[in-house]
Amino acid sequence: MSTHDPISDLITRIRNAQMRSKSKVSTPGSRMRASVLEVLKSEGYIRGYASVEHPSGRSELEIELKYFDGEPVIREIERVSRPGRRVYASVKNLPRVNNGLGISVLSTPKGIMADHDARDANVGGEVLFTVF
């Protein structure tokens, strides 16, 4: 199935799987989704992910979700910049999520990264979504 917004699709799949207490969820594979999942993994919001190749030639990303005491580690995940309304932030105006307890994931000229990494690299970009 073709989606117009692959990031929103990924976020929705993760949110729905965690509401149902699933241990794994799969999503169509792409480099952008893999970059987003790499950020979530490095920040400790998911256990990991793996790329699975199907005989038909398409690839899928299988995401291992993370729980703590039976509760999902991701309490809140929200899309900020959408295809109809893009949201950009300079390095000075990068949003802090819940006073620094969460992260914003950005698409920058240096790749997809968390807000604190963007501050360290002194780059701004498109604010894709926030995680808490």
From Swiss-Prot:
Protein family per UniProt: Belongs to the universal ribosomal protein uS8 family.
Pfam family for this entry, one: Ribosomal_S8
GO MF: rRNA binding; structural constituent of ribosome
Domain of life: Bacteria
PANTHER family in the record: 40S RIBOSOMAL PROTEIN S15A (PTHR11758)
InterPro entries tied to this protein: Ribosomal_uS8 (IPR000630), Ribosomal_uS8_CS (IPR047863), Ribosomal_uS8_sf (IPR035987)
Organism: Rhodopseudomonas palustris (strain HaA2)
GO cellular component, one term: ribonucleoprotein complex
Function of the molecule: One of the primary rRNA binding proteins, it binds directly to 16S rRNA central domain where it helps coordinate assembly of the platform of the 30S subunit.
Entry keywords, A to Z: Ribonucleoprotein, Ribosomal protein, RNA-binding, rRNA-binding
The protein, known as: Small ribosomal subunit protein uS8
Subunit and interaction comment: Part of the 30S ribosomal subunit. Contacts proteins S5 and S12.
GO terms, biological process: translation
